[in-house]
Amino acid sequence: MKKTLIFIVFILTLNAEAFAKETTYKKELFDKAASDGKVVIVSSWIKYCTSCASQMKILKKAKNEGELSDIKFDNIEYFSFDVTNKEIADLFDVQYQTTLLIFKDNKEVYRSIGETTKDLIYEALKASI
C-alpha cells in the first residue's frame, strides 16, 4: 500500500511539472536577442510530456541556480513553445516535442530531439558560448 501511494505521488508530481510549461517565444524578442548578439535557446514542449518538463527544468536550473558557473547567462536568452503551435514549429522546422535548438550569431548551431541528459545539454550550451 505504501509503495502504491509513493508511486501515485510520484506520478502526480510528474504531471504537475508537465502543466508548468508556457510559451515564452515571441518573434520580436527572439529577433532582438539575436541582433544583440545573444545566444538564443529555444525548446519545444507539449502538454503532459514529462521529458519536456525535465529538459526545461535542466535549462531553468542552469540559468537560475548558476549550475554552470563558467557561463555568463546574461548573454543567453531562453524561449519555449508548445509544439502544437504550427506557426512557431514551422518557423523552426520542429516536428517533435523536446526539440532543443541553440542559435548563435543568428544561425542554428545545435539541434537535438529528446535530450534530457543534463551533462549533454550543458556541454551543448558551453560549446555554443
Feature map (PLM): residue ranges:
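Short active-site neighborhood of thiol/selenol oxidoreductases, capturing the structured segment around
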Residues: S35-K47
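Structural micro-motif
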Residues: V39, F92-L101
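Thiol-based oxidoreductase modules, predominantly thioredoxin-like and allied folds used
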Residues: S44, S69-K86
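N-terminal leader/targeting and pre-domain segments
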Residues: T4-L5, F10, A18-G37, K126-I129
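The canonical Cys-X-X-Cys-His
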Residues: S44, C49-C52, L100
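Non-catalytic, surface beta->alpha helical segment in thiol-disulfide oxidoreductase systems
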Residues: I102-I129
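Structural signal for short hydrophobic segments within the conserved structured cores
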Residues: T23, E77-F79, V109-S112
